[in-house]
Amino acid sequence: MEADITSQAVGLASNTDFSLWSLFIRADFIVKSVILMLIGCSIYSWAIIIEKFRSFKKINLETEEFEEKFWKSKSAETFYNSLPVNLENPMALLFKDSMQTLLKAKNKSNLNERMSNMLEVNIEKQMVTLEKGFTFLATVGSTAPFIGLFGTVWGIMNSFQSIAISRNTSLAIVAPGIAEALFATALGLLAAIPAVVAYNKFNNDSKKYLQKLENFSKRFLSII
């Protein structure tokens, strides 16, 4: 490792290119691994963010349409029979599963209580599907800055070792190593900030949709 640091220190004085690519190329294996990990986390986070944004928009529009048609229908059974086979909307799936249970129920005693319990289970199942990916966003938001900080600390340690080996404290020796180290911190923040903002937004959207499902369940129970 000392040999690598020595050769790095020798070349730093003549290499003052601070482009992002140059910072990555000059970094050692550990810092490169941190950078690649953070870039990967950021890309996957953005994939989740885009998918969830589209998903919530679609779900909310379909839910409004579903509720409007449902409450205008003659009866729950008539509306159930008119539903398409392939459903994706959580509220539509909740209603479909509930109606299947209701129509198959032979014993009508305590039906409301049993339906209420089943609706709670189905709501939980739909919310688990809806909140898929939330954990990753929360994890990236909370850990990415610390991963970036680790890369920064490691890079600064390498810079100090370069100074000790070269016995040169000039800015040309110190600056490139510090820049590489701070690059990792910047990437950590770049990955974490969108993930935290998106997680908070989607978590709030999820709570609002949960309230919609619970309200629908209560109204549905009142008419069966």
Regions found by a protein language model. Give the residues of each.
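Short, strongly hydrophobic alpha-helical membrane anchors
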Residues: 1-26
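Hydrophobic alpha-helical transmembrane segments of polytopic membrane proteins
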Residues: 181-195
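Hydrophobic alpha-helical transmembrane segments and adjacent short intramembrane/lumenal linkers
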Residues: 167-181
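Predominantly long cytosolic amphipathic alpha-helical stalk/bundle segments
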Residues: 57-170, 197-224
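Hydrophobic alpha-helical transmembrane segments
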Residues: 20-52
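N-terminal membrane-entry
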Residues: 31-35, 131-141, 180-184
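Residue-level signal for the membrane-embedded core of alpha-helical transmembrane segments
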Residues: 34-37, 41-44, 144-147, 151-154, ...
